[in-house]
C-alpha cells in the first residue's frame, strides 16, 4: 500500500513521537536533502542529488532514509503567493505519489513559498560567491524547509495541539 501523502500536521500524526525526518527541496535538476535529529529539533544538510531518472533519484532518497533511520519525509510544496498551485506544485505532488509507491513512510507536504529566495538572500548576506551559492542552495533550501516544519511542529506541541 502506498505511503500516505498529507499536509504536514496530518502527516505528523502518523509519524512516531521520535525519529528523524528527511526534508526535500525538489527542483527540476536537483533535489536538496536535509535530515533532522531524532528529537526533531535541528535540520542538517545531507546532499544535493543531481536528478537523472525517477528510479535513480528515489533509490538514493530511500537509501538515505534507511541509512539515517528516518520515520517520514517532509516535501516542500511550491505554492504560489496567492495560495494557488501551479505546474511546479503539480509536479511535486506527482513526485510524492511516485515516491509513496516505493515506501511506507508518511510524506508530509509543507509550504515552501520563498524558501529558495530566503536562502539566496542569506547566502548573499554571508558574502558567498555566486558559484558557491549555486553548489549549496538546494541543500540549504531543504534545511530551510525542514527547519520550518520542525519549528511549526514544536510550536504545536508546546501549545498542546
UniProtKB/Swiss-Prot annotation:
Q: Which UniProt keywords apply?
A: Cytoplasm, Hydrolase, Nuclease, Ribosome biogenesis
Instruction: Give the subcellular location.
Output: Cytoplasm
Its Enzyme Commission number(s) read 3.1.-.-
What parts of the sequence cross the membrane? none
InterPro entries reported for this sequence: RNaseH-like_sf, YqgF, YqgF/RNaseH-like_dom, YqgF/RNaseH-like_dom_sf
Query: Which biological processes are named by the entry's GO terms?
Result: rRNA 5'-end processing
Q: Does the UniProt entry include the keyword Hydrolase?
A: yes
Q: Which GO terms describe its molecular function?
A: nuclease activity
Would I find Nuclease among this entry's keywords? yes
Where is the major localization of this protein? cytoplasm
Q: Which domain of life is it from?
A: Bacteria
Give Gene Ontology CC terms: cytosol
State the protein's purpose. Answer: Could be a nuclease involved in processing of the 5'-end of pre-16S rRNA.
Q: What family is this?
A: Belongs to the YqgF nuclease family.
Name of the protein in its database record: Putative pre-16S rRNA nuclease
